[in-house]
Amino acid sequence: MLTNTQAGRRIRAVLKLDRVDIPSLQPITLRALTGRQVAVRTDAAQTCYSSVGQVLLPSATAPQTVSVVGHGGVGVVVAVGPQVVSTRVGDRVIVNFHGACGWCYSCLLARQDQCLNFSGGPPVPTADTTDGKPVFSGSSGMAEVMVVSQEKCVPVFTDVSSVELSMLACVGNSGLGLAMTRCPVQPGSDVVVFGCGPVGLSAVQGAKLKGAAQIIAVEPIAYRRELALKLGADAVVDPNQYTTRTPVQGFSGVNGDFFKDALVDRLREMCKQHTDRTFVGGGRVGPDHVIEAAGGDAYGGVITRPSAGTGPDPTGMTVLSQVWQLCSQVGTAVSCSIGYPPDAKVEIPANQWADGQKQFWGGTCGGTNPRRDGPRYVRLIETGRLNMKALASRTYPLADTVEAYRVAMNRTVVATIVTPNG
């Protein structure tokens, strides 16, 4: 067991040494735990697609400091700092990408997904390299031991496998939150989900759990469309079959189209109500809810070409516009992707901004409160109503972490999992 008196323990971790470095497996020496820090022996950690660029390509957004790769994971607590109260040695925990302090402005407004202290405080080094450089770990799971703040740790009391649970640390957590928290899906709703990676497929399941009458999944890769149908989608669409898109000239009306878009037209047709009579509940144009989890294929100025296939626009910008246009006049649109370049503009007609009644929510982290929702999601797995096993496609040892990210980038499987102590 690691304790503060045993600080100095040598472990292995996948480190990114600088912004142009490809991460590699390195020995590091742990520092003593302080404050609310928790040491967790890592059993499984999923590869978040948003980290692909930082891991495999030179990245202007990667930290300048030496850092451990990863976005959370699952493991067993082996030591706690002197101020830790929410977990204890021996607990099995999900280490979330973001924490929730419970005290900041966002948390007090029940927006724990936007916690202002989501890292548990200012970054501090948790280990040192063999040549004495400080190592920062955040919520990084690609190490034999994670050192994280207690705010990121959610104790779970279950026999569900660590590989399945690891999907709840980041991507699955976000997708479920998109459909079950940020997006007010009601029984009988029509829901369109863009993207069938681990986030989108989790959103499909979340919409099903909320009672959606029709779920349409939009995905360019064939095997992912097939999996979406198995996990709850009622229909699937290949966006590469509907690529015609031309601007509409002139005033488009409060809820009018600003593009003539073949994909939007197709999805509207699939969501068409049985009647257009507005005095008997008809007249809706488009689905009740649109969830975007498509992402893009551009990182740091590099356009990647996933070997499994790609959509019509590798920058991910077109789909952001389609999400808004497709949404019905009083519907809800939720998006968790960032187009490329990050400062690119998504244009919305001014009259729709003021007079339209569409609702839009940014969906990063899915609106999830980890301590509240994590145990709920675990219970849904236990009862067979939520399938994370189907998303956790392939496991890798810690030494093959970079390859796990490469496979994730190529999208040949839904999600890859690293088992540092497996």
Across the structure, where does each feature detected by a protein language model lie?
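Rossmann-fold NAD(P)-binding glycine/threonine-rich loop
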Residues: 317-326, 338-357, 374-376
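NAD(P)H dinucleotide-binding glycine-rich loop of Rossmann-like/cofactor-binding domains
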Residues: 101-194
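Short N-terminal strand-loop motif that marks the start
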Residues: 1-74, 140, 144-148, 421-422
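C-terminal hydrophobic helical "lid"/dimerization subdomain
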Residues: 1-9, 252, 277-278, 311, ...
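N-terminal Rossmann-fold NAD(P) dinucleotide-binding loop
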Residues: 200-201
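Adenosine-nucleotide cofactor-binding segment
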Residues: 193-196, 208-322
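Glycine-rich beta-strand-centered segment in the early N-terminal region that forms part
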Residues: 29-47, 58-108, 113, 155-160
